[in-house]
Amino acid sequence: MDKFGDIRPYTDAEARDAFKRMADDPHIEPITNYIKPGLPVEAMRGLLSSLTSVWDFQHKVMYDVVTSIIRQTTAGVTYSGLENLKDGRTHLLISNHRDIILDPAIIQVLLYENKVHTTEIAVGDNLI
């Protein structure tokens, strides 16, 4: 097994299994009520069960969740430098590390809204 295998991002095949586990998890009801008030839990289960890729999850679930958090908890988000990202090249993006989960999620939204490929994120267990 790869040295970092336990913290690497899911492949699409692994993600499909994870989406089904999420749909069946007993915590899905309170999570749904929090992130999508008014959405019937069965609709969330159906959505999660229909996802086929990490991209689907980012586009159909997380985008709405993160933009809702931004609207409800900030006066706005500012950024600069996206014009420096070159297609086909890898880049390292660094935030000020206020929130180990939310910072990269907001970066994903900014990339998505600017039609830049989103990133893969791994979080070490020493940071959780």
Regions found by a protein language model. Give the residues of each.
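Membrane-anchoring hydrophobic helices of lipid-metabolizing enzymes
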Residues: 1-91, 97-108, 112, 118
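Short glycine-enriched loops at secondary-structure junctions
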Residues: 97-99, 124-128
